[in-house]
């Protein structure tokens, strides 16, 4: 530096220190340290802390309040503190002091960077004794070996992962962890190590004066030092906890990019920033986690539409597999990150909700937003109001409706910036469509700032939907893989050709040689069609019924060559083994015969664990063919090279064009296949009807709001009055005019007008005691007001079907007279769904046998319900019964027996055999009971007379939701972890959410059988998200408790500022 220039005083960052373990290994101070120059005083004070800490082998966990001072440079710049610290350094050089502490270990300074909210030390205590000795090694392992895409995050390692790192190539040194490298023999030393070595090479000074001074004043200085440190520790606690520097840098960079994206998205310019107004990190995450490097042209066009930039409502439609979901995800991320608003995504089925939760949790962890599940019995009403981060709610149709109601009731709907609806065409499908219509109508009516995006592959009357949603429309015929449609009549295959006179042209004849026996067993020539593609390519065979799926799978295996058994034989054996583990030693006999050939069936008769396992095996190519029902086409994405429709029927109903398009849309896998094929098998008698099917327009989407009376228009009116959206007849009529039904009223209404239907529905609700009519004004029609009764409030809060609300009230009221709590049977009966009971038909012999095995107390429950053993015995014997018994009560009690047995045994297979019911049906019954139990709980919360049920139903709902041993429940809270997987994780040492949140996906893959990398990453991400949600909720509750009450007496007076300030100080301390 040239003379005359100002000298730069460099601030030296200070490592965290732990005085008790460093004394014996400190290097002696240099002469420069004893006689500091004027311009190096700060460096000398800081230099006394930069000492060599010893080798990592002796590292041990030492937590003290001194760790808080590591990042506070200002503490070291005080000359007085530096002097005190220097005196202490000299005192520690005394021989007796060194001897006394000669055996002390040192703390690994690198491990300070691992001190996040999730600590490894809590995991070590839960490990087996023989593995705990490796616990200290794990604190250094935060870099996974051979990072896969999406696995580049830092994970703390729980005890169950020790076996992975005992392998030499997986050791900390092999992984390249800088915290475990030794300085000796290392040609590339870190800057810190070089600095330490430069001090240790200096000659030792004379310490006579410091020794005498330290010996005489050690006690006084120690007391003074402790007092100062105690005071500073108290001040430090009020600060934000220190995080690793790398995390701060990442968050700062992300925050800066989000700020730039906010300005870009609000700017009228067409320049959208790095990635459609989003940080470049979003683009990187799509590459890492999903392998998406570039968007399709139509996706870019859609995202840059002027209507999208102006946040207008949008409907877009493309063929299946066209990439619709990616556009919706980018729009959701814009809302969450750039506009800082919550988002609601509505999906049709629970399985799809869970799949989407798993895939988006990694984005939430990296980008700083919550992903919350609202499906089945999961979901909190009203949702937690987050302090800083925003929430992405992923919900089924029913849960989305309850969520919107809760947001309207708490005046928080304005926080919802975007609603995304997948499979928008479902608005025209029965009661679920009516609920979806009500949800969207309420959002449109009560919030002018919430944007709605709807997408579907099968839409016809888009104009009606546009009018309802006030939306723009975008469509494209893009498919990443070309689809060729064929028809098979006898042995001839025709290609669908819209230009041909009869809609099809000749393609080819089947050349497969059939024996006479094979022709009888396989009249549709399925063996010939599937052997053209399997086992090298995948194939889906859609069948009319569940039983037909199983029969076709077995038939194919009988006539396939034995060579198919050798294809990926080892992996298929592993699938059988996994099925056996899921079934507690039992495997479906059909699957046991078909899986070795690479074939399986897929329908609702499987348990969710079995379905998930078979879907994963199919996706990875272990299974090459699935025989399935039409529900697979609308469920999870399982594409195939060839799709075969066994018949143009679903059960006994002829196929609709919407259903046909969804099924054939599964043909062709983007990035894998160059083309996709669909073949519809038909007989001559159905030929004309099939030609109309493939060439005709899609079915019109119509409102079911009035057709579904109790679940539709009545439930809508009750909630409108309960939420105070509308109170008078005129307001309700105005609301109805803006619904999808209001848009289509000219088409749908033949006999009554919309006004007459509105009046009739309100009168019916009043007669049932759900509404009460107030005095009317001069204009008795429009100005007639209504208010909701307590029963009505409970019904709409609990989302109870109004056809059963009065029955539920009577059952709960009767239960109070003699509730049997010695067992769960009585409570289970009260929470067994009414609609499932109406559809069931008991096996009377099984019913009689199970009744006889009840204890006297449990039989007393049946007696209270009016069902006697003699009645069931007569029904089992086929005798006539003169005594009239309510059929619904009898059926409901039978289903209660099934649920009661399941809760006691927690084994679907044994209960399935006991009651002669499909295991999939039993699991669906369990899920329905858990959901209805949650509804009954909310119903009881609104009625004081049912206070006794509240605590009882909370526990029952939890038991029905998980139906496993208590120790597995914490693991099953993680999305995507079902009973079989939870058992594997528990046995491997993962006992809590904290374990999973800190897990290394690579170690999970090696530790847990049949777990893919993708699944491992999703489990870890979902666990992290759940843990963050819980931590955020607890922090919010704590802040709420410490917040100064707004209605505190005296706040309005002249001395309120002083009083408020004083009260705030007390609260925060």
Swiss-Prot record:
A Pfam family the protein falls into: DEAD
GO molecular function: ATP binding; ATP hydrolysis activity; DNA binding; single-stranded 3'-5' DNA helicase activity; single-stranded DNA helicase activity
Helicase ATP-binding domain mapped to chain residues: 305-477
Protein keywords: ATP-binding, Chromosome, DNA damage, DNA repair, DNA-binding, Helicase, Hydrolase, Isomerase, Nucleotide-binding, Nucleus
PROSITE patterns: HELICASE_ATP_BIND_1, HELICASE_CTER
Amino acids binding ATP: 318-325
Gene inactivation effect: Mice display Fanconi anemia-like phenotypes, characterized by subfertility, germ cell attrition, interstrand cross-links (ICLs) sensitivity and cancer susceptibility.
Domain of life, source organism: Eukaryota
Composition bias type Polar residues, residue spans: 157-172, 197-210
SUPFAM superfamilies recorded: P-loop containing nucleoside triphosphate hydrolases (SSF52540), Sec63 N-terminal domain-like (SSF158702), Winged helix' DNA-binding domain (SSF46785)
Reactions the enzyme catalyzes: Couples ATP hydrolysis with the unwinding of duplex DNA by translocating in the 3'-5' direction; ATP + H2O = ADP + phosphate + H(+)
Gene Ontology biological process terms, A to Z: DNA double-strand break processing involved in repair via single-strand annealing; DNA metabolic process; double-strand break repair via alternative nonhomologous end joining; double-strand break repair via synthesis-dependent strand annealing; positive regulation of double-strand break repair via homologous recombination
Annotated region (Disordered), positions in chain: 1-73, 129-239
Residue ranges with Basic and acidic residues bias: 131-140, 179-196
Keyword Acetylation: no
Record's subcellular location: Nucleus; Chromosome
Keyword Ribonucleoprotein annotated: no
Biased composition (Basic residues): 7-19
Quaternary state and interactors: Hexamer. Interacts with POLN. Interacts with RAD51B. Interacts with RAD51C; promoting association with the BCDX2 complex. Interacts with the replication protein A (RPA/RP-A) complex. Interacts with RAD51; stimulating HELQ DNA helicase activity and ability to unwing DNA.
Record function comment: Single-stranded 3'-5' DNA helicase that plays a key role in homology-driven double-strand break (DSB) repair. Involved in different DSB repair mechanisms that are guided by annealing of extensive stretches of complementary bases at break ends, such as microhomology-mediated end-joining (MMEJ), single-strand annealing (SSA) or synthesis-dependent strand annealing (SDSA). Possesses both DNA unwinding and annealing activities. Forms a complex with RAD51, stimulating HELQ DNA helicase activity and ability to unwing DNA. Efficiently unwinds substrates containing 3' overhangs or a D-loop.
Name of protein: Helicase POLQ-like
Species this chain originates from: Mus musculus (Mouse)
Gene designation: Helq
